[in-house]
Every structure is written in structure tokens, then in C-alpha cells.
Amino acid sequence: MSRRLFTSESVTEGHPDKIADQISDTILDALLREDPTSRVAVETLITTGLVHVAGEVTTKAYADIPNLVRNKVLEIGYDSSKKGFDGASCGVSVSIGAQSPDIAQGVDTAYEKRVEGDEDELDKQGAGDQGLMFGYACDETPELMPLPIHVAHRLSRRLSEVRKNGTIPYLRPDGKTQVTIEYDGDKAVRLDTVVVSSQHASDIDLDSLLAPDIREFVVEHVLAQLVEDGIKLDTEGYRLLVNPTGRFEIGGPMGDAGLTGRKIIIDTYGGMARHGGGAFSGKDPSKVDRSAAYAMRWVAKNVVAAGLAARCEVQVAYAIGKAEPVGLFVETFGTAAVDTEKIENAIGEVFDLRPAAIIRDLDLLRPIYAQTAAYGHFGRELPDFTWERTDRVDALRAAAGL
């Protein structure tokens, strides 16, 4: 079979774009905590010494946005100008307006009710925008995620962990990881290259201190976890590149401006699946960019967990103000155990993909989003990540005739 290399990347919570994502979702959580019906679309820009928050919100809740911003920045680890940013002293600018009544009309009273007179409660809420969303799952890891993004996220999480627990005390919050894996056909067989770039204190020698510490306490630690998880991958002789520029002292918002929604491939499947283009952070679940993408992950993961396919990508599409999806597409890449049309029909029978039904079934009107904003929205089986449940396996198998 043909051999090929596939690469995915991740970033730490201290990357400027991820700081912005976490701030946006922290504000969302604060509003949902007081008013679960809040409509929120919050964007964050972060640059040297300044955080600017803008967007549209309709809510009965109050949020002390400057205080939320500062606490989140400090929690991430930016507490000194020596690190390039200080949450205690940075400026915070807020420009929040109300949601457009034209959008609210379509969300609050869907096309099905306004035009067709439908009285079904779940038909009353329309999609918050038009758009297309993808979900993906495969059997490369126990979490049914692609292996390259799985490993890249683990490396990024570990990079932050060794900084926070003092194992590598001279690290700073900003960091990136990248993983290249060799595939034989569709099977991951060998780790080819690992890239780790981490912000660090001044006067740290790359060759004698940083690179050996990263190899021992970050990379080898993660590779040992893969073995514990039963993932078979040849890791002998992999290439490790640590801070290939030679130095990474200036980082965080001082090194690069950060924006909400700039890491959508890292947030999802690391490039292994297609993406509809919509970002997640700062958006309440009436926005199908977020809620339907979560639902598609739920669908695809249940399809693979049910044994209907080894790889599954699902696309859904919506029209603004309409409850029912306008399109559903299933791709199994030649791995289906039954006819793909049967899988598509089974999905339609088992899953209700109207926005109100997604919000109900995944219990999305909760303050759960800040924890999604770093290290991936998918593949982490945390209690609040309801879209990672495989609770429709039996129903799918029955509907597909297995």
C-alpha cells in the first residue's frame, strides 16, 4: 500500500489566539450561568498590553467583563511583564452591543412556524445562521480521533503541565506542537517528526537544557501514555525539533496579536477532516456553527463506535431561521460495514438535528465552554463534553439492520 506523511499541530493555552478563545468562552459561561437563554457572540482581540472585547449580546445577566478577562489571563500564566503580558495591569476595552432583531426573529420563531404554521416545539427555534458543519471520527485512538491531532494536543497539554507544576520552571505560557505521522494506506504506523516550540526565560541554553528537558519530560512522557493506551506506533528514531528558530523569549501577545476563532483546525480534527469554516468560541449554542459541529462529532463518533464504519465524516447544512437541516451527507471512505445510504437513513432516524433538539439532547445551555477553548473541542471525554458520548450505538445498529 502507499505510504504517506500526515501532519497536525496544536498550541498551548498561552498562545495568543487561544487566550482570545478562552476569554470569549469565559464571558459566554458567565452569561449562561446567570441566564441560560443568553444570546452571545463575543470576539476578543489581544495585543501588547491590551485586550479588546467586542460583539453582540442579548441577556438578562450581568458580567464584570474586565475582571473576567484579567482573571483568565492570570490563570493562563501571564502575570508579569517579563513574560510579555500581565493580566493584573493590562488594559481591557469592551464594545458590546445587542443582537440584531432581524437575526433574533429567525431564531425565536423559525420558518416552520412563521410560514408553515408548524406547532412542534422543536420547530420553533430556527438556525442562528446559514452554514455547513462537519463531524468526524475514526478508529485510530480509543477516543475515536485521528492520531496526529491526538498526539499534538497531548504534547501541548503536557507542555503547559510541566510549566505549571515546576518540572520545567523556566518555560513560559506560549507554545506550539506539531506531529508528523507516517501512514501505510489508512493505518498510522510510524512517528516521523515532532516539533515543539516553547516560550522560555532568557539565558536558557537550547542544546544543553531546553531540548533535553523537552524530550524527557514532554515528548517521552506522551509517547509512554500512547503505549499505555494500547496505541501501536513505531516511535524508534523519530526526529525531534525543539525551538527550531534557536530562541523563543518574546511570546504571547507581545510576540503576536491574538484573535478569537483563528485556530479552527486545531479545535477540530487537525486537518484530517473537512471544515465548514465557522469558529466556536464566544458563541452560544443557538449558533449552529458551534452546536451543529458538536452534534456532527456526536453522530460520527456513534457511527464508528457502532461498527458501521472505521472512518466517518458527516456534513450538515442549515438555512438561517429554519429549524430542519437543508442537507445531510455521509462519507465513510470505503470503510462502511453496510451501504452508506443505510447509514445516512439510520442517522436521520436516530438523531434529531434541529437546533432546539441538539441543544436539548446535548444539554448545551450550561456554562461549560471555557474548558473547550484549549486543547481541542473533540476527543476529550470529560463529563461536560456530552457530544463525546456513544449513547446512540444500539439505536444506530438497529436502524442500520445490524
UniProtKB/Swiss-Prot annotation:
K(+) binds at residue 43. InterPro entries: ADOMET_SYNTHASE_CS, S-AdoMet_synt_C, S-AdoMet_synt_central, S-AdoMet_synt_N, S-AdoMet_synthetase, S-AdoMet_synthetase_sfam. Keywords: ATP-binding, Cytoplasm, Magnesium, Metal-binding, Nucleotide-binding, One-carbon metabolism, Potassium, Transferase. Residues 99-109 are annotated as: Flexible loop. Pathway: Amino-acid biosynthesis; S-adenosyl-L-methionine biosynthesis; S-adenosyl-L-methionine from L-methionine: step 1/1. It is found in: Cytoplasm. It comes from the Bacteria. It catalyses: L-methionine + ATP + H2O = S-adenosyl-L-methionine + phosphate + diphosphate. Its main location: cytoplasm. ATP binds at residues 15, 174-176, 247-248, 256, 262-263, 279, 283. Mg(2+) binds at residue 17. GO terms for biological process: one-carbon metabolic process; S-adenosylmethionine biosynthetic process. GO terms for molecular function: ATP binding; magnesium ion binding; methionine adenosyltransferase activity. Disulfide bonds: none annotated. One of its GO terms (cellular component) is cytoplasm. Its cofactor is Mg(2+); K(+). L-methionine binds at residues 56, 99, 256, 287. Binds 2 divalent ions per subunit. Binds 1 potassium ion per subunit. The keyword Heme does not apply. Its EC number is 2.5.1.6. Catalyzes the formation of S-adenosylmethionine (AdoMet) from methionine and ATP. The overall synthetic reaction is composed of two sequential steps, AdoMet formation and the subsequent tripolyphosphate hydrolysis which occurs prior to release of AdoMet from the enzyme. Belongs to the AdoMet synthase family. Homotetramer; dimer of dimers. HAMAP family: S_AdoMet_synth1. This is S-adenosylmethionine synthase. It comes from Streptomyces griseus subsp. griseus (strain JCM 4626 / CBS 651.72 / NBRC 13350 / KCC S-0626 / ISP 5235). The gene is metK.
